[in-house]
C-alpha cells in the first residue's frame, strides 16, 4: 500500500510574498550563516538516510552549494544501488521525480544515470498512470497532488512529455485534492505554483506549444493559488520554501511589502526556535536549507556555485525525533489500544501496538511502513488506508479532566472545504 499523502509539519516555516528586488529578505543573512550548522549536520546523519530517500538530502546539498564530495558520492551511490534493486513499479511518481531533480541538479555526472535509465520518460509514464487513475476514481490520483505537482515540475524542467490539457484540467485551485485537514494545503499549493510557473515559462519561451487561453488559464491558477496561500495566514510547512522564487516576483503594495518583511524576520527566529526538534530530521533539514540560502527547485537545471559565504559545519550527534501527527479530519473507524495515566510518544505507542499484536494479531493486527518522516500505519485489523477513497490512519490522543489519557489510531478521511 502506497503512502496516501505526505503528512505535513504544521506551521514551522513562513515565507514572504515580496517583489524580486527585495527577495533577499526571505533569505538568511550572512551574519546568521553559523546557525545553519545544525541543519547541515542533520543531513550528514547517514544512519537515518536509506536508499532512494537520500535524494532529498542530495538535492538540498547541491542546491545550497554545500561542498561535501564524500557525502554526495555516498548518497548518489546509495540511491543508484537502491534503484537497481527495485522494480520501477515500486517507486511512486513523486519519488522518481525527486530522484531526477537530485541527479539533475547542478549538471553533475549523475545526469548520465537519468539518461541511461530513461528516468524522465518513465516519469512521463507514471504521470499518465496518475491521470488514468483520476479518470477512473473520482479525480483521485495514485498518490496525491503534492507528488503530482512534483511530477509536472520535473517533467517541465527536464523537457519530458506532459499534456497541457491535463494541467489546465486537473490543476484548478478549486480541485478537492488541494485540501487537507479541512483546509487548503499550502504545501501542495506552493509546489503547484512552481510547477505551473515552469509550465508558463516554457509556453512563453516557445519550448512547448499551447493556446493563448491555456496560458491565460495557467496564469489565473497561479494567482489563485497564491491568494489561497495568503489567505491561510502565511502559516505553512517545510515544503513551502520552494515557492519563494515565484511568490517573490509578485507586485505588491509598499504596505504589504513592509508587512511581509516583518514576517520574513520572524521566519528565521521561529526556525531557530524549533531547530532543536523537527529540524534534526535529515529530511526536514533538507527541505528548508536551500530556501534559507536563496535557492529553489527552479534553480535545479542551472550550474550553481558555492554560497558567497562558506558555511562551516561541526559534527554533532543528531538524535532521532518522532514524527508529528496531523490534525484530526473526520473519524471513520477508531481502534482504542489502551488507557494510560502518563503521556507517551508515538514511538513508544507503536512498541505497545507491536507487543499487543504478538499477543493477539486478530484484535491488534496492523501493518506499517517506514518513511523518512517516521513510521506510517497502512492498515489496522485488516482495514487499509485507501488512496482512491482518500483515507489514511493517524495517531490520535485525547484526554478528559476526570479520565486518564486515551491513545489510539483512527481511520480519517481527507475532505474538501
UniProtKB/Swiss-Prot annotation:
Its biological purpose: Binds vitamin B12 with femtomolar affinity and protects it from the acidic environment of the stomach. Binds to cobalamin and to cobalamin analogs such as cobinamide.
Cysteines paired by S-S bonds: 156-198
Protein name, per record: Transcobalamin-1
Gene that this polypeptide is encoded by: TCN1
Tree of life domain: Eukaryota
Subcellular localization(s) per the UniProt record: Secreted
Keyword Ion transport: yes
Keyword Cytoplasm: no
Keywords of this entry: Cobalt, Cobalt transport, Disulfide bond, Glycoprotein, Ion transport, Secreted, Signal, Transport
One GO CC annotation: extracellular space
Entry-listed glycosylation sites: 90, 161, 166, 179, 312, 328, 345, 360
Pfam families with a match to the protein in the record: Cobalamin_bind, DUF4430
Protein family according to the UniProt entry: Belongs to the eukaryotic cobalamin transport proteins family.
Signal peptide positions (record): 1-25
One GO term of the biological process aspect: cobalamin transport
Residues covered by region (Globular N-terminal alpha domain): 24-308
Binding site for cyanocob(III)alamin: 143-147, 187, 287, 376-377, 393-395
GO molecular function: cobalamin binding
Positions of the UniProt region annotated as Flexible linker: 309-327
Annotated region described as Globular C-terminal beta domain, given as residue ranges: 328-417
PTM comment text: Contains about 30% carbohydrates.
Tissue: Haptocorrins are a family of cobalamin-binding glycoproteins found in blood, salivary and mucosal secretions.
InterPro entries named among the record's database cross-references: Cbl-bd_prot (IPR002157), Cobalamin_Transport (IPR051588), Transcobalamin-like_C (IPR027954)
Amino acid at each position: 500500500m502506497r503512502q496516501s499523502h505526505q503528512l505535513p509539519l504544521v506551521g514551522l516555516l513562513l515565507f514572504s510574498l515580496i517583489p524580486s528586488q527585495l527577495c533577499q529578505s526571505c533569505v538568511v543573512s550572512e551574519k546568521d550563516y553559523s546557525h545553519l550548522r545544525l541543519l547541515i549536520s542533520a543531513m550528514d546523519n547517514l544512519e537515518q538516510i536509506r536508499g532512494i530517500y537520500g535524494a532529498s538530502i542530495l538535492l538540498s546539498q547541491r542546491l545550497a552549494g554545500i561542498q561535501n564530495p564524500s557525502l554526495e558520492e555516498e548518497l548518489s551511490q546509495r540511491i543508484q544501488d537502491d534503484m537497481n534493486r527495485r522494480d520501477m513499479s515500486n517507486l511512486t511518481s513523486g519519488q522518481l521525480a525527486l530522484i531526477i531533480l537530485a541527479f539533475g541538479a547542478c549538471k553533475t555526472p549523475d545526469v548520465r544515470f537519468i539518461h541511461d535509465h530513461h528516468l524522465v520518460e518513465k516519469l512521463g509514464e507514471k504521470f499518465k498512470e496518475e491521470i488514468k487513475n483520476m479518470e477512473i476514481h473520482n479525480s483521485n490520483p495514485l498518490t496525491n497532488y503534492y507528488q503530482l505537482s512534483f511530477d509536472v515540475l520535473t517533467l517541465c524542467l527536464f523537457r519530458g512529455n506532459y499534456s497541457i490539457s491535463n494541467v489546465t484540467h486537473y490543476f484548478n485551485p478549486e480541485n478537492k485534492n488541494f485540501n487537507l485537514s479541512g483546509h487548503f494545503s499550502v504545501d501542495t499549493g506552493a509546489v503547484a505554483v512552481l510547477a505551473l510557473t515552469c509550465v508558463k515559462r516554457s509556453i512563453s519561451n516557445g519550448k512547448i506549444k499551447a493556446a493563448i487561453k491555456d496560458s491565460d488559464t495557467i496564469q489565473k491558477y497561479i494567482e489563485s493559488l497564491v491568494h489561497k496561500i495568503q489567505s491561510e495566514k502565511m502559516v505553512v510547512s517545510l515544503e513551502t520554501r520552494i515557492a519563494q522564487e515565484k511568490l517573490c516576483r509578485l507586485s505588491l503594495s509598499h504596505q504589504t511589502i513592509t508587512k511581509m518583511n516583518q514576517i520574513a524576520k520572524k521566519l528565521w527566529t521561529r526556525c531557530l526556535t524549533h531547530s532543536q526538534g523537527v529540524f534534526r530530521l535529515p529530511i526536514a533539514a533538507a527541505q528548508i536549507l536551500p530556501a534559507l540560502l536563496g535557492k529553489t527547485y527552479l534553480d535545479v537545471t542551472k550550474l550553481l556555485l558555492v554560497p558567497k559565504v562558506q558555511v562551516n559545519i561541526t559534527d554533532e550527534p543528531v538524535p532521532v525525533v518522532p514524527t508529528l501527527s496531523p490534525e484530526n479530519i473526520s473519524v471513520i473507524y477508531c481502534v482504542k489500544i489502551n488507557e494510560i495515566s502518563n503521556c507517551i510518544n508515538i514511538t513508544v505507542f507503536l512498541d505497545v501496538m507491536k507487543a499487543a499484536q504478538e499477543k493477539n494479531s486478530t484484535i491488534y493486527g496492523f501493518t506499517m511502513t517506514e518513511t523518512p518522516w517516521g513510521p506510517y500505519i497502512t492498515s489496522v485489523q485488516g482495514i487499509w488506508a485507501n488512496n482512491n477513497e482518500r483515507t489514511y490512519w493517524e495517531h490520535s490522543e485525547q484526554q478528559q479532566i476526570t479520565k486518564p489519557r486515551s491513545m489510539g489510531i483512527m481511520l480519517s478521511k481527507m475532505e474538501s472545504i
